[in-house]
């Protein structure tokens, strides 16, 4: 029951973020904060042993995107950074494939825009929140399996 509640909570946050980021090009702190409170409220009492992994995943995902925001200021906003951290809280280690999917999808969309509209498309800004949300959904349903496959194939 708690797993379903956690999945629904994350899916709701990702939907709200996608709609808002596409419409206003901002990821509101209120959505992210509410998502964090709900996520912790579900996980802490039902699966407290997973909290260190989830905290590490949140710090790792948020820190990774923070590097992009700091070194490439126009490319990534702080809302994206905070969303990645929130996804780490919900997904744990499955946030790694979620971010990989998000970056791949965003890159393919950018490439498609450049191929379709030429150099002019390089000056456009495309919100990254919807790509993070898509990656989050993949992470939600297949993230652990993708993580295990990657480790077994390339590391072990």
Language-model region placement:
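Transmembrane alpha-helical segments of multi-pass small-molecule transport proteins
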Residues: 6-12
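Functional transmembrane core segments of multi-pass inner-membrane proteins
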Residues: 12-110, 115, 148-156
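Interfacial loop-to-transmembrane junctions
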Residues: 112-138, 150
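Transmembrane helix-loop-helix
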Residues: 1-4
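Aromatic-anchored segments of alpha-helical transmembrane domains
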Residues: 40-43, 137-141
